[in-house]
Curated annotation (Swiss-Prot):
Protein family according to the UniProt entry: Belongs to the HpaH/HsaA monooxygenase family.
GO biological process, one term: fatty acid beta-oxidation using acyl-CoA dehydrogenase
Name assigned to this protein: p-hydroxyphenylacetate 3-hydroxylase, oxygenase component
Organism: Acinetobacter baumannii
Lineage of the species this protein comes from: Bacteria, Pseudomonadati, Pseudomonadota, Gammaproteobacteria, Moraxellales
CDD domains, per the entry: NcnH (cd01159)
Binding site for FMN: 112, 146-148, 169-171, 292, 296, 374-375, 396-397
Recorded coiled-coil stretches: none
Alphabetical list of InterPro entries matching this protein: Acyl-CoA_dehydrogenase, Acyl-CoA_DH_C, Acyl-CoA_Oxase/DH_mid-dom_sf, AcylCo_DH-like_C, AcylCoA_DH/ox_N, AcylCoA_DH/ox_N_sf, AcylCoA_DH/oxidase_NM_dom_sf
EC number in record: 1.14.14.9
GO cellular component, one term: cytoplasm
GO molecular function: 4-hydroxyphenylacetate 3-monooxygenase activity; acyl-CoA dehydrogenase activity; flavin adenine dinucleotide binding
Effect of residue 120 to D/N: Loss of hydroxylation activity. 7 to 10-fold higher rate constant for hydrogen peroxide elimination
Amino acid sequence: MENTVLNLDSDVIHACEAIFQPIRLVYTHAQTPDVSGVSMLEKIQQILPQIAKNAESAEQLRRVPDENIKLLKEIGLHRAFQPKVYGGLEMSLPDFANCIVTLAGACAGTAWAFSLLCTHSHQIAMFSKQLQDEIWLKDPDATASSSIAPFGKVEEVEGGIILNGDYGWSSGCDHAEYAIVGFNRFDADGNKIYSFGVIPRSDYEIVDNWYAQAIKSSGSKMLKLVNVFIPEYRISKAKDMMEGKSAGFGLYPDSKIFYTPYRPYFASGFSAVSLGIAERMIEAFKEKQRNRVRAYTGANVGLATPALMRIAESTHQVAAARALLEKTWEDHRIHGLNHQYPNKETLAFWRTNQAYAVKMCIEAVDRLMAAAGATSFMDNSELQRLFRDAHMTGAHAYTDYDVCAQILGRELMGMEPDPTMV
């Protein structure tokens, strides 16, 4: 046989591009266009260069830049899960999640914070009609940040509660008109009732304490509440929201998204951001490797066999993560379409699938970063930002796979849920 000479500058690069192509395009066909014929994903792609350009300055700012918020609101993404009666879009979870994946490749902090501002609208739609009217009839563009761990101290009073406390990790709070906060009430027998309340921006102070090493631009600051009165119509039991018993459940009988619990919507952004980071890491690694040579010998290391093996394995791993998430998102969409409330096992899979996908994305990013060279750790390197941000997506309580593995394992073995794991 005649020996074949492989042209590393063309043949290998084209082969790698063929591998990457399915990842970039796998879900674009599913987007639903608006009346102008342009899908939300296409609108995201149009503003993506400016979002990416702002990424480094956004880290220095430690919150989402005003320009990014303006761009995203101009295309209407903040209305993704708002009821149509208030001008919302009621997007399907697959369509929305893929927008966040794309956005995260440009700026993970922006994607993290804005996805939560969007998904909180789904949760608000589970509260009373009185609350929804109060928010969206006054300002149809209003959004809410959140801090739902029960940090505060509750005092029961006539018509509601008085709440005091410091509420951390409220991503996107600088750009929200309201906040959803968590707290514990107690019934007559002394049992805890985990609940949520909605408060307007005038009722709390934002404490600028967000000094993090990753997802820096999310602006996940602390909310300080001092003697805040929350009336009953702005309060809901968390359990009711997960079981279809809240005041807002059933208000929108024609909706395809409000017959599933709020929590899978709330959490969808975490895994979508992780996936977007990992997919961008593959592209950024490929761009860097094209002309990378060893400093001491001049040898081409970027297209050497070890680099090709790493990029191949990470590509497969990220594709597997995407496939798992797409199946989860689509299952969620079908449940909503059929007004079919998910059972406990389905909810357990929805929760834990996302955490496992995040785990795979982090592993894929780590594999590439380990072979990206010292310059990839410089402050101005996109790769080190992607590396840091990827790990932060796995640090959230909802994406902790050690917890999620126990949740799913208990469900699969017919055991009762552990109340210490949420």
